[in-house]
UniProtKB/Swiss-Prot annotation:
Protein's recorded name: Lysozyme g
GO terms of molecular function: lysozyme activity
EC annotation from Swiss-Prot or TrEMBL: 3.2.1.17
Chief localization: secreted
Similarity comment text for this entry: Belongs to the glycosyl hydrolase 23 family.
Other remarks on this protein: Shows preference for N-acetylmuramic acid residues that are substituted with a peptide moiety. It acts only as a glycanohydrolase.
Active-site residues, Swiss-Prot/TrEMBL: E99, D112
Organism of this sequence: Gallus gallus (Chicken)
Amino acid sequence: MLGKNDPMCLVLVLLGLTALLGICQGGTGCYGSVSRIDTTGASCRTAKPEGLSYCGVRASRTIAERDLGSMNKYKVLIKRVGEALCIEPAVIAGIISRESHAGKILKNGWGDRGNGFGLMQVDKRYHKIEGTWNGEAHIRQGTRILIDMVKKIQRKFPRWTRDQQLKGGISAYNAGVGNVRSYERMDIGTLHDDYSNDVVARAQYFKQHGY
C-alpha cells in the first residue's frame, strides 16, 4: 500500500499504467497472430486460374508478391485501421489480396457480379456500404466485419487458441460462422475450400513485408 512518503512508488505505478494503456491502444495482437497459424496455403483450384502450376503456401506467396505493389498504395490506411482495431494489418492485407487482388480485378470498385464492394468485397446484400471502395472507411468496415466473425468463433469454440480462433474468423468472413464446424475442416464450404489457409499464407507474406 502506498503511503504519503512514497512518491517514487506512485511514479512507477503511473508509468506502468501508461505503458499498459499504450500497449492496448497501439497494439495489433488482440486477436492472435498469423505468424503462429499453421496453413496449407492455396488450393490448386485457386492457384490454377492465377496461371500457376503449383499449389500450397508457395502459390499463396507468389500471388501475394504479385499484389504487393498495388497493396502498398493502401499500406498506410491498412496499418492505421489495424492499429485502431487491434488486429494485425497483415490479416487485412491478406483478405484484400484474396478478395480483390488489392483492387486490380474490380470494376468501378465492384466485384462478385455487382454484389461485392471495395477492396474487402463487403456484400451489399448483407451490409450497408460505407465510404469509397478504396478508402479508410471501407477498410474499417470490412475489418469490423472480420472482427465480428472472430468474436463469434471465440464464443463457438472457446477452447481454441486465439490464433485458431483468428483463422476460424477468417474462414467465416467468406462462408459464415455456421460453416466452421471443426478446426481441421473449417475451409470446406468456402470458395475453393481453402479460404482461410490461403489468406493466412498471404498474410504471412505481407507481414514479412512491413504489414
